[in-house]
Amino acid sequence: MHPSAMRNCKSFFEVYASKMEGGTVLDIGSQDVNGSLREVTPKQFKYVGVDFEKAKNVDVVLDSPYIFPFADEAADILITSSCLEHSEFFWLTWLEMLRVVKPTGLIYVNVPSEGQYHAYPVDCWRFKLNAGHALQKWGKRAGFNPLLLEAYTDAEPPWHDSVAVFVKEWDNHSLYPDRINTDEL
């Protein structure tokens, strides 16, 4: 995990989860490659690392990256960093993320907007600032009601992380008044 990805996720937890008493955090794409988001997940949360191969920091191995072995609304928070660029059909993964998060739950997405090719096992995508809006629209089209709380592009090279934070149900946005980045969407 590159340093800016760790820093951005740590900021997410500090801003959005600091007042939460605990719950379950699912980390999609959790394999420890030079670090893991487990390191920045607050101790009051039960962290579950999820990936499609058995490796360091993987608690649950997926049979398919597009079908998660969790009940509907099982997680309080879902995080994914440096993962969706490796998903050939990230829009299917996105819908599974929405399915497994509680209505008051949060989804944190971090995908490079730039950077060199890095296949694990493939490298298909880069996200730009408007990717969060597109994910919100795709979720609504599929029958969910997510709200993009914030989106920004990190200035640190070489990845210039594209970060987006969502609440699963639009009606619950008032639970999360604070933001990592105070710039407007």
Q: What is the meaning of each model-derived region?
A:
Residues P3, L84, R126:
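Charge-dense, low-complexity intrinsically disordered segments
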Residues D76-E88:
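A short SAM/SAH-binding and catalytic strip from SAM-dependent methyltransferases
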Residues E88-L185:
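S-adenosyl-L-methionine-dependent methyltransferase catalytic module, highlighting the catalytic core
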Residues D63, C83, P112-E114:
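Beta-hairpin (beta-strand-turn-beta-strand) motif
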Residues M1-E73, I77, V163, S174-L185:
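Conserved N-terminal segment of class I S-adenosyl-L-methionine
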Residues S64, I79-S82, P121:
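Generic anion/oxyanion-binding catalytic loop in active/binding sites
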Residues D27, T80, V109:
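Redox-cofactor binding/interface segments in oxidoreductases and associated redox assembly factors
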